[in-house]
């Protein structure tokens, strides 16, 4: 009896072993075409000689029977800028690739391009040969030529003297880039500045950065990942830090996606026609600094869009500061006399803050939070501003406050679109911000962010 059981067990083990031998499975060439999850794969914009991240599409066998795909190859063969990975193997051409009935497989794609000009298009096709002919999936990517600034042990990555960055090449910063004391960096219109993860820039005392963008030719400062997904998430890079006595002149820039955007330590700045959004901490972090801003748009920062510490002097005219950060709502602007330095010591300074013809909005109860201390100057004026306000926790009252002139309180500004992926902070025609501006203040900034005149019936915020 035991011998019979043993013999039967050996028989079934043999059957299973034979049935699991892949070489004995019957695969046929597909009689009909395969199905694909996409007919075109759009890869991230990539930089000259930098390998992209991997992208994928799926190949489906909708038939009941198992099939073998006779040939899968890149159209440009070994000369292609792309590489594909099929069934765990990387290359440019594959033969006799099996695919079971009612099953699918991934094909992974990456590109390691070369570029001979500022921007080029790289295309290829993945050809799938079947019994019914050849199916194709198109591969598409934009390739940018790039100049690299890489910090290493032997290269501290310091710029000295006067430098000008043009839009002929993207600027890629790996590690920290330092602009030496007394030096000047000019960043011209249309230039794109990309920071790798955990990278940033330090502008030393007495150094100057001039950002000279223009409408439709803005200077872009962001993380190095160009996929649209990364446009909406923070902490892809660190910050641009301006040390004591340094200077920033910024016009028409888009700064987004880092930990802190512009970090000022007793520095000076003039910021015009600029959009700053999506930062892990602050879009602007200012310690006892002097900042003049107009047509400034800010949104989506976890601690606050604009953080002011240890006082300073600030003048904001026709700015749109809304904070749509989720899940924990945060203010648009916070200001105080104190700052805790890196040694844990508390430093204090006098504050002078003027905000005119602006939108100060948040999904939190208070768009503006003040933290004055006794014994220090805390001077402010908010004139003709739309403001989200709750006296609890704001640090100031609006009713009967001579420093708050002609406010529009707790009304929805009616933005066109607050989604970060589609952000448009123009206001609709029925917005309570329409025609609410002080004309004398509007005359100091006569054109809005898109160069529309606002000298008559000025709208609050950066857009007329």
How should these model regions be labeled?
Residues 52-53, 64-69:
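Short acidic/proline- and small/hydrophobic-mixed sequence motifs that coincide with surface turns
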Residues 16-19:
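C-terminal motif of bacterial Sec signal peptides marking the signal peptidase cleavage site
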Residues 69-74, 120-124:
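Contiguous beta-strand segments of beta-sheet-rich domains
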Residues 59-63:
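Asparagine-centered strand-capping/turn motif at beta-strand->loop junctions
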Residues 108, 455-457:
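Short linear motifs in exposed loops
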Residues 1-9:
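Bacterial N-terminal signal peptides that target proteins for export
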Residues 73-93:
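Short, solvent-exposed loop/linker segments at beta-strand-coil boundaries, enriched for Pro/Gly
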